Amino acid sequence: MASLLCCGPKLAACGIVLSAWGVIMLIMLGIFFNVHSAVLIEDVPFTEKDFENGPQNIYNLYEQVSYNCFIAASLYLLLGGFSFCQVRLNKRKEYMVR
């Protein structure tokens, strides 16, 4: 039977920690972009043309960046799930008799 174990216990634990931090940070950033935080205007990819038609174009760009943050957070969540599975497989491997 083929094993799905491909990471050691330390790498898997590191993956869980980094994934948890990435999910928390990106969800918070997504929320702040979604409420159109003025502090984050430097991180919105706008051009001079976007300022001509009022704030609606800028708000749409804020929401697009917000969606990108939520998508990245979901990818970090998947990576955290994979790392958790690797931790479980490593613990199971310790108790198996060879």
Swiss-Prot record:
<keyword id="KW-0375">Hydrogen ion transport</keyword>
<keyword id="KW-0968">Cytoplasmic vesicle</keyword>
<keyword id="KW-0378">Hydrolase</keyword>
<dbReference type="GO" id="GO:0030665">
    <property type="term" value="C:clathrin-coated vesicle membrane"/>
</dbReference>
<keyword id="KW-0540">Nuclease</keyword>
<dbReference type="GO" id="GO:0000220">
    <property type="term" value="C:vacuolar proton-transporting V-type ATPase, V0 domain"/>
</dbReference>
<keyword id="KW-0813">Transport</keyword>
<dbReference type="GO" id="GO:0004521">
    <property type="term" value="F:RNA endonuclease activity"/>
</dbReference>
<dbReference type="GO" id="GO:0006898">
    <property type="term" value="P:receptor-mediated endocytosis"/>
</dbReference>
<dbReference type="InterPro" id="IPR026770">
    <property type="entry name" value="RNase_K"/>
</dbReference>
<dbReference type="GO" id="GO:0012505">
    <property type="term" value="C:endomembrane system"/>
</dbReference>
<dbReference type="GO" id="GO:0045851">
    <property type="term" value="P:pH reduction"/>
</dbReference>
<keyword id="KW-0254">Endocytosis</keyword>
<keyword id="KW-0406">Ion transport</keyword>
<comment type="subunit">
    <text>Interacts with the proton translocation complex V0 of the V-ATPase. Interacts with ATP6AP1.</text>
</comment>
<comment type="function">
    <text>Endoribonuclease which preferentially cleaves ApU and ApG phosphodiester bonds. Hydrolyzes UpU bonds at a lower rate. Regulates the activity of vacuolar (H+)-ATPase (V-ATPase) which is responsible for acidifying and maintaining the pH of intracellular compartments. Required at an early stage of receptor-mediated endocytosis.</text>
</comment>
<dbReference type="InterPro" id="IPR056552">
    <property type="entry name" value="Ribonucl_Kappa"/>
</dbReference>
<keyword id="KW-0812">Transmembrane</keyword>
<dbReference type="GO" id="GO:1902600">
    <property type="term" value="P:proton transmembrane transport"/>
</dbReference>
<dbReference type="Pfam" id="PF23489">
    <property type="entry name" value="V-ATPase_su_f"/>
</dbReference>
<keyword id="KW-0255">Endonuclease</keyword>
<feature type="transmembrane region" description="Helical">
    <location>
        <begin position="65"/>
        <end position="85"/>
    </location>
</feature>
<feature type="transmembrane region" description="Helical">
    <location>
        <begin position="13"/>
        <end position="33"/>
    </location>
</feature>
<dbReference type="GO" id="GO:0048388">
    <property type="term" value="P:endosomal lumen acidification"/>
</dbReference>
<keyword id="KW-1133">Transmembrane helix</keyword>
<comment type="similarity">
    <text>Belongs to the RNase K family.</text>
</comment>
<keyword id="KW-0472">Membrane</keyword>
<dbReference type="GO" id="GO:0019065">
    <property type="term" value="P:receptor-mediated endocytosis of virus by host cell"/>
</dbReference>
<protein>
    <recommendedName>
        <fullName>Ribonuclease kappa</fullName>
        <ecNumber>3.1.-.-</ecNumber>
    </recommendedName>
</protein>
